[in-house]
Amino acid sequence: MSVPLLKIGVVLSTMAMITNWMSQTLPSLVGLNTTRLSAASGGTLDRSTGVLPTNPEESWQVYSSAQDSEGRCICTVVAPQQTMCSRDARTKQLRQLLEKVQNMSQSIEVLDRRTQRDLQYVEKMENQMKGLESKFRQVEESHKQHLARQFKAIKAKMDELRPLIPVLEEYKADAKLVLQFKEEVQNLTSVLNELQEEIGAYDYDELQSRVSNLEERLRACMQKLACGKLTGISDPVTVKTSGSRFGSWMTDPLAPEGDNRVWYMDGYHNNRFVREYKSMVDFMNTDNFTSHRLPHPWSGTGQVVYNGSIYFNKFQSHIIIRFDLKTETILKTRSLDYAGYNNMYHYAWGGHSDIDLMVDENGLWAVYATNQNAGNIVISKLDPVSLQILQTWNTSYPKRSAGEAFIICGTLYVTNGYSGGTKVHYAYQTNASTYEYIDIPFQNKYSHISMLDYNPKDRALYAWNNGHQTLYNVTLFHVIRSDEL
């Protein structure tokens, strides 16, 4: 930055010197500083008065003067000589001087342009330096902020890890305890081996019997853990959107391992075709299915598939049919005496839903209503092979007021509606023949539920909601008493 500034200073001082020299020297070279004017002291002119230069060859001469009759002044002037040789040298000097001045002016212009260019360069460099300085400041501030953020993150991580210190201490203690248990088990194993050698075969069989008894008690405990009181229902998962507003879909809770077939029945009356999908994935993503034709049309949406057979209510009757899906033959038919049918005691949504068949951990059930029970819900436990009624419970809940119903672990749960806001608000326990009013939220996503059944294998509710096939997970509360083990 210092070199362009020195150039500017030199140019300015040079221009000042040239200006001073031209103001002092140039007039003397062209003869502008020797001109003198003289006048007579009196107010009148005479013949001997005039303005004369010192050298008669340099200027005009007043030769004589007089006054005419009218009072006008008449002067006789002698013109200078035509030869101007004495001026030629000065003219030549002036021309040379002018050329020098012009050359100097051109040099000054060139130098000025260079100076302006250097000045622009200096200004540009100055702006770049300012920008670079600003960037350095930003980088410095950003670095400080980044360090501060890293410090905060490390501090937060340390705050998170600090509570783990006592946990690690507990783990150390647990590790020591595990080692102690391992040593004790090894000692116990050696002791048992010694006892086995001493006891003999008969006592070993007795020990084996005790182990088998423990296994049976463990299985019973696991079975009891599978059942419980309903405490919550998850939000629905939409599996597929197909069919009309009414229908049913299901899987077989007693299907063997690897059998994941899905059964699909569209409509609620006067239809007899059942779709079979190979798996839930096929049901969700394709329309590849096998069609089964039932010998009679069904009524309502209360069908179930259980242990390879489909159970349904024959259209416009109170007859239940068990149909084998493999052989496509009727295995058993039975009439539910006094059960209402043909829209006599349907659910609140209608649709010939008089008889609703269900399954749970305990087997096959039928839910319906009779005149003898004043149109209130009746629960019957059925034999899945013979369809005989094993036991019946009469409730005080009106069938027409129920939106839908399902059974979990022998307890019938009833919803208060089928459209809009819905909840499970009534439960009847068949094992104690008691009921209670509950309040379990139930999200009715598509505002028209026409089928709701529990699958004990999946621990889930299957629903048909306004042409959408949905699933709900359930939460069960388990209470196991020590005397039941």
Curated annotation (Swiss-Prot):
Span of domain Olfactomedin-like: 226-478
GO biological process: atrioventricular valve formation; cardiac epithelial to mesenchymal transition; negative regulation of gene expression; neuronal signal transduction; positive regulation of apoptotic process; positive regulation of epithelial to mesenchymal transition; positive regulation of gene expression; regulation of axon extension
InterPro entries xref list: Noelin_dom (IPR022082), Olfac-like_dom (IPR003112), Olfactomedin-like_domain (IPR050605), Quino_amine_DH_bsu (IPR011044)
Domain of life: Eukaryota
Coiled-coil parts of chain: 87-225
Post-translational changes noted in the entry: In isoform 3 and isoform 4, the signal peptide is predicted to end in position 17.
Residue pairs linked by disulfide bridges in the UniProt entry: C227-C409
UniProt keyword list: Cell projection, Coiled coil, Developmental protein, Disulfide bond, Endoplasmic reticulum, Glycoprotein, Secreted, Signal, Synapse
Keyword Coiled coil found: yes
Signal peptide segment: 1-24
Tissue: Expressed in the brain (at protein level). Expressed in the brain, predominantly in the cortex and hippocampus. In the pituitary only the two A-type and in the adrenal glands only the two B-type forms were detected.
Cellular localisation: Secreted; Synapse; Endoplasmic reticulum; Cell projection, Axon
Residues carrying a glycan: N33, N103, N187, N288, N307, N394, N431, N473
Cellular component GO terms, alphabetical: AMPA glutamate receptor complex; axon; axonal growth cone; endoplasmic reticulum; extracellular space; extrinsic component of postsynaptic density membrane; extrinsic component of synaptic membrane; glutamatergic synapse
Domain comment (free text): The protein contains a globular N-terminal tetramerization domain, a long stalk formed by the coiled coil region and a C-terminal olfactomedin-like domain. Interactions between dimers are mediated by the coiled coil region. The dimers interact mostly via the N-terminal tetramerization domain, giving rise to a V-shaped overall architecture of the tetramer.
Complex and partners: Homotetramer; disulfide-linked. Dimer of dimers, giving rise to a V-shaped homotretramer. Isoform 1 and isoform 3 interact with RTN4R. Identified in a complex with RTN4R and LINGO1. Peripherally associated with AMPAR complex. AMPAR complex consists of an inner core made of 4 pore-forming GluA/GRIA proteins (GRIA1, GRIA2, GRIA3 and GRIA4) and 4 major auxiliary subunits arranged in a twofold symmetry. One of the two pairs of distinct binding sites is occupied either by CNIH2, CNIH3 or CACNG2, CACNG3. The other harbors CACNG2, CACNG3, CACNG4, CACNG8 or GSG1L.
Primary role: Contributes to the regulation of axonal growth in the embryonic and adult central nervous system by inhibiting interactions between RTN4R and LINGO1. Inhibits RTN4R-mediated axon growth cone collapse. May play an important role in regulating the production of neural crest cells by the neural tube. May be required for normal responses to olfactory stimuli.
Record protein name field: Noelin
Originating species: Rattus norvegicus
Gene from which this protein is expressed: Olfm1
